[in-house]
Amino acid sequence: MGEVKRTLIARNSESFSFLYQEVIDSFGEVTFFDPETDFPSFDDVGLLYLPGGYPEKHLEALVANESCRKAIKDYAEQGGRIFAECGGMMYLCQSIKTDDGEYPMCGVLPYSISARKADRKLSLGYRRLMLDGKEYRGHEFHYTQFVGDTPKSITQVYNAKGEPVATPIFRHMNVLASYTHLYQIPDCL
């Protein structure tokens, strides 16, 4: 039997704070790190989990920790598995644009995010989707938007009434990402 690897989870008080205890418990061995201040160790990591939060409120701290952003990009480029939800997905993008400027992020995903006031649009509600024949549920809550092209979704996402919504869940390299916060981690990671 193969060695069980640990899950590395980004967590702090605001920029990566949308975590469900049931999700954390489902991982087995976990290690937490703060992308604003820590340098993560990827030794024996089987999955990097970047949950949601408000990275757009802490951009200067995230940009200042360049070694963390580079380590995450290197991990992704070397085939490391990543699951990123909302703020975590934003952190993996090329940049986040605000009214104060453009801030480089990890550069793993080939997209940029706008958090500009002029681009604000509330996306809110319960979501459900199918991945590899299994239904997953979650919620969506954000004001930010993709700049330019939106990723092509690998499955249709629905609201609580069963109506299709435009929120993509997508893959890039070994990354599974979406604005949707899922209540359980997909088996297909």
Locate the predicted segments by residue.
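Amide-donor transfer/coupling interface in amidating biosynthetic enzymes
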Residues: 1-9, 14, 113-189
